[in-house]
């Protein structure tokens, strides 16, 4: 058994003035402290290669996924660290900060050393991939980096305090959470105490580190993902038996393509479970992906090229600037029940 110490010891990296540092010095500091692992690159949506100079670094300061945390709330008290983090990123490449038109925090709307763009619209407007596609698309031979806004705060803490502090503000959400709330958690934190006594107990549950569309399934005794600022709990749905399946007319269940009459009832809240409600079948070229994919890319043709392993066609159709999360809504509405 490994027990936590009563007091936490920190390795001291020393406070640093970012304004007097060059790109190599910033990069070395992040690598030494282990913070470079929070920077991803496109193409491939993998940990960024520090030997490659990106044409831009993109930060999305808002999340439009279901029940997503409000970054303005997480930003309170961390404004100075956030700006320092942006300053550090700007030393390495031109940095783009994407915000929502609804956000009013001065630390976002008046951030320095970055190009600020305000976005409006429903999910997936908050996806950094959508923002890259509209601001500076990635072509063959080009690289961009992405980083989530709370990781920008991690970087700011490093330079302002000389210490690594992986504390995140995490939203505990989902229809099966008794008291949805924000909490402070370390990256990789054990989730047992977060869920204990705070979820329903009369059904099987799906625990997710992240959101329901692109998060990762965990156990109730699992751990917080390194890139996640949200925890979600929904019904598993494996105990539900419905007469005649999808053929039965219903007024209380959601359907993306109006298969049920519930769309006649106007906007309302639904309790969705983890069921796929059907088996995987042949891909149907229906145009349904295009309705939820606001990028200058043809998603159905790109997916077909990926399935066929046609690299030339993948390159021509935009494989370099997308990530799995960009296809999350496509997977949700997919009539073929394909795992994209």
Feature locations, PLM:
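Buried, small/hydrophobic-residue-enriched core segments of structured protein domains
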Residues: 2-340
